[in-house]
């Protein structure tokens, strides 16, 4: 049995679709699965069982990447095609059964929207897979030695990045002697290009308790390292979804984005947001997303984030 699974080029959306892939892996354990996705998430899907091929789609002018994918897949008679990109290509190849992204209820979480496409109930939760090499690299990044608080202080847009000084204060509160993670080590995670923000946070942590995972790992290795941590707190980002997918208790910090769509998924997760909505944060005169250089999340207080983290931590054993 052959399955073609077409998913996102972006890390966050790609991770949110892993539950759908896992659904088909479990439903058809004999299947050979080809995944088409962006280069950034190719390593994540390459770890999955039953995935025999990953086609990394690099966006090209005139949508040539779709034409190239069509050339690579047209010669196969697919039993199932899952297209979460709603591409024309999935309609031009032979398949006995197709699941194609269409109009969705924008009030529902992305995981629920994906579940509706593939007729899965309950919605399959995102999940990640790791081979022995990935686990060994994660162990080198976050060695054993007591609980670790993982922090993701960056995001793909300055507007939805909580100020670095707030992260520093939050870390100090949560690792205080009378708090939930007294004297815990702190691992700071960030991707290449996010070093400036991330190092502001890392350098404020006592040297003996800091773990530097800034621009030092691919998404799949970073996710494996987060799996070793006791708690993850970070901005709305692909890394936040990785943390949730590996089962680490995850607190997402939201400002000018949509928690109803993109909050971290799972009972082991929570989110806290600015008092203002996306529209309220971005409706000021002269707003242009391309020219925003600073955080739009100043109204999310450290006290609110700390309270949400403590509440999440206290309810985890009850899950």
Sequence positions of predicted segments:
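Catalytic machinery of carbohydrate-active enzymes
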Residues: 1-319
């Amino acid at each position: 049995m052959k399955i073609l699974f077409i998913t996102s080029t972006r890390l966050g959306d790609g991770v949110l679709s892993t539950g759908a892939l896992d659904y088909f892996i479990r439903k058809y354990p004999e299947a050979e699965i080809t995944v088409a996705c962006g280069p950034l998430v190719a390593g994540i899907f390459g770890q999955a069982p039953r995935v025999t091929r990953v086609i990394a789609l690099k966006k090209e002018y005139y949508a040539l990447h779709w034409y190239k994918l069509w050339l690579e897949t047209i010669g196969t008679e697919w039993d199932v095609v899952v297209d979460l990109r709603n591409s024309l290509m999935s309609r031009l190849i032979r398949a006995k059964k197709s699941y194609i992204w269409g109009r969705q209820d924008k009030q529902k979480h992305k995981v629920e929207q994906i579940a509706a496409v593939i007729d899965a109930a309950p919605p399959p939760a995102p999940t990640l897979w790791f081979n022995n090499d990935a686990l060994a690299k994660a162990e080198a990044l976050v060695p054993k030695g007591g609980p670790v608080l993982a922090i993701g202080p960056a995001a793909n847009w300055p507007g939805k990045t909580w100020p670095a000084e707030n992260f520093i204060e939050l870390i100090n509160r949560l690792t205080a002697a009378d708090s939930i993670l007294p004297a815990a080590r702190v691992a700071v995670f960030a991707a290449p290009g996010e070093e400036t923000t991330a190092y502001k946070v890392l350098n404020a942590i006592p040297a003996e308790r800091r773990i530097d995972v800034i621009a030092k790992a691919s998404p799949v290795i970073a996710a494996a390292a987060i799996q070793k941590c006791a708690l993850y707190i970070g901005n709305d980002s692909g890394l936040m979804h990785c943390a949730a997918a590996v089962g680490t208790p995850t607190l997402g910090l939201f400002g000018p984005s949509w928690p109803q769509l993109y909050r971290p998924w799972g009972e082991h997760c929570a989110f806290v947001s600015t008092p203002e909505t996306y529209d309220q944060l971005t409706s000021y005169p002269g707003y242009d997303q391309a020219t925003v250089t600073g955080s739009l999340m100043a109204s999310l207080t450290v006290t609110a984030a700390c309270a949400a983290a403590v509440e999440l931590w206290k309810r985890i054993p009850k899950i």
